[in-house]
Swiss-Prot record:
Belongs to the protease inhibitor I27 (calpastatin) family. This is Calpastatin. Each of the four flexible inhibitory domains can inhibit one calcium-bound calpain molecule by occupying both sides of the active site. GO terms for cellular component: cytoplasm. Specific inhibition of calpain (calcium-dependent cysteine protease). Plays a key role in postmortem tenderization of meat and have been proposed to be involved in muscle protein degradation in living tissue. One of its GO terms (molecular function) is calcium-dependent cysteine-type endopeptidase inhibitor activity. Pfam families: Calpain_inhib (PF00748). Residues 30-61, 68-104, 320-331, 342-377, 384-399, 446-496, 566-579, 587-650, 706-718 have a biased composition (Basic and acidic residues). Residues 114-124, 400-411 have a biased composition (Low complexity). The keyword Nucleotide-binding does not apply. The modification Blocked amino end (Ser) is found at S290. Residues 1-189, 210-238, 266-291, 320-509, 543-718 are annotated as: Disordered. The modification N6-acetyllysine is found at K49.
Amino acid sequence: MNPAEAKAVPISKEMEGPHPHSKKRHRRQDAKTEPEKSQSTKPPVDHEKKAQEGKPKEHTKPKSTHKHASDGEGKHGRNEKTASRSKEPVTPAKRTEPETKPQDTKPAGGKSVAAGTTAAPGKAGDPKKEKKSLPAAALAEPKPDEPSGKSGMDAALDDLIDTLGEPSETQEDSTAYTGPEISDPMSSTYIEELGKREVTIPPKYRELLEKKTGVAGPPPDSVTPLGPDDAIDALSSDFTCSSPVASGKEAGKEAAKSAGEVLEAESAKVMRAAAPPQEKKRKVEEDAMSDQALEALSASLGTRMAEPELDLSSIKEVAEAKRKEEKVEKCGEDDETVPAEYRLKPATDKDGKPLLPEPAEKPKPRSESELIDELSKDFSQAKSNEKQPKPTGKTEESKAAVPAPVAEAVPRTSMCSIQPVPPKPASLQKSTVPDDAVEALAGSLGRKEADPEEGKPVADKIKEKSKEEEREKLGEKEETIPPDYRLEEAKDKDGKPLLPSEPTAQLPALSEDLLLDALSEDFSGPSSASSLKFDDAMLSAAVSEVVSQSPASITRATAPPPDTRPSNKELDDALDKLSDSLGQRQPDPDENKPMEDKVKERAKKEHKDKLGERDDTIPPEYRHLLDQGEQDKPEKPPTKKSKEIKKPAGDQDPIDALSGDLDSCPPAAETSQATEKDKSKTTTASSSKAAKHGDKAKDSAQTTEETSKPKANEKNAS
């Protein structure tokens, strides 16, 4: 510190203290008696202010208050007070000085200042004792009277300044940290790349390089590394004389220069202190000795051989095999690669069959009539109601114009193929139907009924289609019949098949005209033969009807052409007379039954031999019981069914049957009987057409007849 600053600090600190009244007195005395000292202390104060600007502003509040007071007074004493106040919290050593000065400042003059400066360093170590002694000394001081020359404004300002008190001292926090130890575990490590230096090359790769290029590897590391002291002792043992060492140094330097300064051994720089202690002198000497040994060692090594250049021509590029892209199936990409445990199992029903997905319901397609109804429902209905009665009359007239069909009942056998279609009236064919009639007719028609098959889902149609597929049944062809169940042909003794005894003569195919001529030539008898008179056209029509009812498809005759056809009235009369002569047809009970009932009845009519139904099937143990029971019972008369059932006549061609009766011309009574016989024959032919399974029914009837006959014989025998 400057001596001026050292003098200025105690003067300014003298005025500060715990008792403001004592400060006032000393300030006033100093201001009056020593104005020169206050002027001399101003430059150091300004210097200290500049020094404090760089420091942190800890006490801003006291500065502002003291500046305000100094502006009001405008005196040198006040300026000194503000300078001393602002300079207070600089160092803890300075804070202790003003506490000790009030006791030493009793004598006035520069001696008190010098005593304060000398006493400060000695008492700096006991700040607590000084604080305790201050208040007692301050109370013991007598209060001198205030000067009469001071105004009341200054006294008021002094009192106001005294009420502010001293700025609080900032004590530095000197408490030691007792928390956990903070450590930074992160550390940077340098990892050298493989092969960057020769040391980092792996041994196996080094062998390959030595074989190809002949480069020798680095020398192997020593097993036990020597310390610095051991190396110095080993090297310095040979250097007992100083002269060879010097010569060795010179030789080493010359060799290093001649080799182009390939290898240079630098001595380690030693940082020497100004006055090293006695303990470190020995270590410095050892370092100097080690430098000399290293230089001698480097001189003895000689020059380093230059590395040979690599011959790049001998290096061959390694040709790697070209890689091909192969598609590898991933697990789960296909169904086959999915493990069995993870496969999705389809939903099955009770029988284990997979459930078909329910088809989505498709909207039903609307018909034209429905679309027309929807489009026309918004129109007014008054016009349609008015127009409806008009076409009804027209339709009734048109219906009346159509000729009514024949009212008389004609048997089906005679009216099957020759009934003429009523011709359409010319008025309906030529005249166009008016629009009003069409609208009325469309309004009277009901809505189209939905087709039940139309709304069925696709799955049902597929099922129905599969049901309609035809398949060859077992036994339908001879190839499908097992060999054990095939019919064996009749063979002679030599094993040759027997030929039919009388080969059937094939009749030539006759045309319709020849058949009609053959049938009509026998009707040339006398008029007394029959009471009916027919024209040739009527007769041909009647004969064609009979021929059309025959089972032979070739002999069916169609109606005559329209040019030769007679009038409808005459034909109807002829047919009526012919139908009257035939008599009424007996209805066939099996004709109107559905196909399912026939199949069921046929299944019921099939006969199977039951146990005990015949004598052959009765066990011998139970035969005597039946014999005893039959002796007690009276004999039953033969049933009516057995009498009525007769063997049906053999099938005969209806044409032959008809033509056989027409060879002779019997009387009228005989002709009527013949017509009745013809009627019965034609009915049998028609019934054979209606019932396809008639042969099986006959077989069942024969079996029942045969079974009834032995039973009746047994009863008669018993």
